[in-house]
Amino acid sequence: MTKVLFITANPNSAEGSFGMAVGEAFIEAYKNEHPQDEVVTIDLFNTTVPAIDADVFAAWGKFAAGEGFEALTEVQQQKVAAMNTNLETFMNADRYVFVTPMWNFSYPPVVKAYLDNVAIAGKTFKYTENGPVGLLEGKKALHIQATGGVYSEGAYAAVDFGRNHLKTVLGFVGVNDTEYIAVEGMNANPEKAQEIKEAAIANARELAKRF
């Protein structure tokens, strides 16, 4: 059975977000097309996603020195345990669907924190004499991103840092089979916002058949 992580990073629901509306349409279509698969929703705004901070570095230092989990402070244990849960869930999945808005040329900070939780040496990638090698080969990902302007092509494509960073990190851990759906231009062309949304939903439903 294929396991799909539906990873969202938006404080708004589908009623208040173009991207979430497209994401929900995709995942519902996917469930209809693949009823045997397991879909797990991860709302990053309602999930414990520790940032790499002094506590995490201190915990990693203790592990490197040969100390065990019991040597960590209570706060360090809580953060490491949450990070390990996020990592194990990510490693055990076969498909990833990220739904994010663009905020100031990137995605919400919690997405970066989540990627820091799951891009871990020895777990999702390893270092070799020929360079780093991803360990999650054979998996697939989709990124659905909503932007007020147009960033998928043209002069502003170079500053679509969220899309580029996510694709880079996924490739680094071995997930090179990626798809992208742009839900874009709603603020630049407000009179076409509904049309843009409906076109993206149609695209998402079609992609769900072969994802």
Swiss-Prot record:
Its EC number is 1.6.5.-, 1.7.1.17. Binds 1 FMN per subunit. GO terms for molecular function: electron transfer activity; FMN binding; oxidoreductase activity, acting on NAD(P)H as acceptor; oxidoreductase activity, acting on NAD(P)H, quinone or similar compound as acceptor. It catalyses: 2 a quinone + NADH + H(+) = 2 a 1,4-benzosemiquinone + NAD(+); N,N-dimethyl-1,4-phenylenediamine + anthranilate + 2 NAD(+) = 2-(4-dimethylaminophenyl)diazenylbenzoate + 2 NADH + 2 H(+). Its cofactor is FMN. It comes from the Bacteria. It is an enzyme of class 1 (oxidoreductase). InterPro entries: Flavodoxin_fold, Flavoprotein-like_sf, FMN-dep_NADH:Q_OxRdtase_AzoR1, NADH:quinone_OxRdtase_FMN_depd. Signal peptide: none annotated. Keywords: Flavoprotein, FMN, NAD, Oxidoreductase. FMN binds at residues 102-105. Homodimer. Quinone reductase that provides resistance to thiol-specific stress caused by electrophilic quinones. Also exhibits azoreductase activity. Catalyzes the reductive cleavage of the azo bond in aromatic azo compounds to the corresponding amines. Belongs to the azoreductase type 1 family. This is FMN-dependent NADH:quinone oxidoreductase 2. The lineage of its organism: Bacteria, Bacillati, Bacillota, Bacilli, Bacillales.
